[in-house]
Swiss-Prot record:
GN (gene name): mnmA
Main location as per UniProt: cytoplasm
Similarity comment text for this entry: Belongs to the MnmA/TRMU family.
UniProt entry tagged with the keyword Transferase: yes
Top EC group: transferase
Protein name per its UniProtKB record: tRNA-specific 2-thiouridylase MnmA
Subunit-level organization: Interacts with TusE.
UniProt xrefs under CDD domains: MnmA_TRMU-like (cd01998)
GO cellular component, one term: cytoplasm
Classification via Gene3D superfamilies: Adenine nucleotide alpha hydrolases-like domains, HUPs, Translation factors
Annotated active site: C102 (nucleophile), C199 (cysteine persulfide intermediate)
Region listing for Interaction with target base in tRNA, in residue ranges: 97-99
Annotated source species: Escherichia coli O1:K1 / APEC
Length: 368
């Protein structure tokens, strides 16, 4: 290893993607060290066990690769900058995306600063399925090579400066290749399943978890025609387009179509439902977004044609974007879209390049 080798701190989660990222960076000649982040203190037994197992797996991988593993506690930052906002959004009847917030405030802010200032890193690296490319002197965020795993939707808040300081080794690979590398290396994480659930809080029963922090208020479920057909256990447990968990499966309105959530009346604590996943009340012709983040950090004015995702794993939607003011845009879809959800993120693309995005403030309903 040359003395001039750049130092990279890899965010080690105890999963297969970060494990293979560390090895790939070693192969590329970087001086590699790992960092395990603890971001949640409200430990119940089950969560404590999961975090302990993840740390043990991260340590086992680092031992196998012959690299040092640091640990850091960002629980206070997570609570203040991610979790409290997450709760406030749910309380207001919106559906936030904690993974996006967590990337913005923890992985590419607290971690990036800690790695540079405390550990002397030249770069950080994560196991995200995205790529970076330099265009006109600025780093761009590109979709991951594996379209099934692309995670650019969750990283749209990053600036070109943050991307320039970050490496994404598995973004150039497909998931089966990553697992095969881990198996060939004999890493304990090779067959570990991908984590789901709230960022850093792990997999747990969501209703039960949310109910600890926000008291649920039961209320009426009514149809779009105003008929009361059931009771919900709390508006915060429901999101637009939701079909399961409504408890009204046996009630039919002269048709066999299932019921879907089409709106939430937060003021009166009423859940509004309709039958059919393409009911006009569920469709939107566009949206208004705010809290904008453009990767190039250039202010957006005028209009542009691009594509948008209003949720993860959605097929790109062709659209026209128009600036309303410095921090608000209007987005008009080429075709109506179902279940556009306030609180979620709208993320914009020009081909492979992620341009940035914003929070959906309101949807523009299909005129009925």
């Amino acid at each position: 290893m040359s003395e001039t080798a750049k130092k990279v701190i890899v965010g080690m989660s105890g999963g297969v993607d970060s494990s293979v990222s560390a090895w790939l960076l070693q192969q590329q000649g970087y001086q590699v060290e790992g960092l395990f982040m603890k971001n949640w203190e409200e430990d119940d037994g089950e969560e404590y066990c999961t975090a302990a197992a993840d740390l043990a797996d991260a340590q086992a991988v680092c031992d196998k690769l012959g690299i040092e593993l640091h640990t850091v506690n960002f629980a206070a930052e997570y609570w203040d900058n991610v979790f409290e906002l997450f709760l406030a959004e749910y309380k207001a009847g919106r559906t936030p995306n904690p993974d996006i917030l967590c990337n913005k405030e923890i992985k590419f802010k607290a971690f990036l600063e800690f790695a540079a200032e405390d550990l002397g890193a030249d770069y950080i690296a994560t196991g995200h399925y995205v790529r970076r490319a330099d265009v006109d002197g600025k780093s761009r965020l590109l979709r991951g090579l594996d379209s099934n795993k692309d995670q650019s939707y969750f990283l749209y808040t990053l600036s070109h400066e943050q991307i320039a300081q970050s490496l994404f080794p598995v973004g150039e690979l497909e998931k089966p290749q990553v697992r095969k590398i881990a198996e060939d290396l004999g890493l304990v994480t090779a067959k570990k399943k991908d984590s789901t659930g709230i960022c850093f809080i792990g997999e747990r029963k969501f209703r039960e978890f949310l109910g600890r922090y926000l008291p649920a208020q039961p209320g009426k479920i009514i149809t779009v025609d105003g008929d009361e057909i059931g009771e919900h256990q709390g508006l915060m447990y429901h999101t637009l387009g939701q079909r399961k968990g409504l408890g009204i499966g046996g009630t039919k309105d002269g048709t066999e179509e299932p019921w879907y959530v089409v709106d939430k009346d937060v003021e009166n604590n009423i859940l509004i439902v309709a039958q059919g996943h393409e009911h006009p009340r569920l469709m939107s012709v566009g949206l208004i977004a705010q809290q904008l983040h453009w990767v190039d950090r250039e202010p957006f004015t005028g209009t542009m044609r691009c594509t948008v995702k209003t949720r993860y794993r959605q097929t790109d939607i062709p659209c026209t974007v128009k600036a309303l003011d410095a921090d608000r845009i209007e987005v008009i879809f080429d075709e109506p879209v179902a279940a556009v959800t306030p609180g979620q993120s709208a993320v914009f693309y020009n081909g492979e390049v992620c341009l940035g995005g914003g929070i959906i403030e309101q949807r523009l309903p299909l005129p009925v």
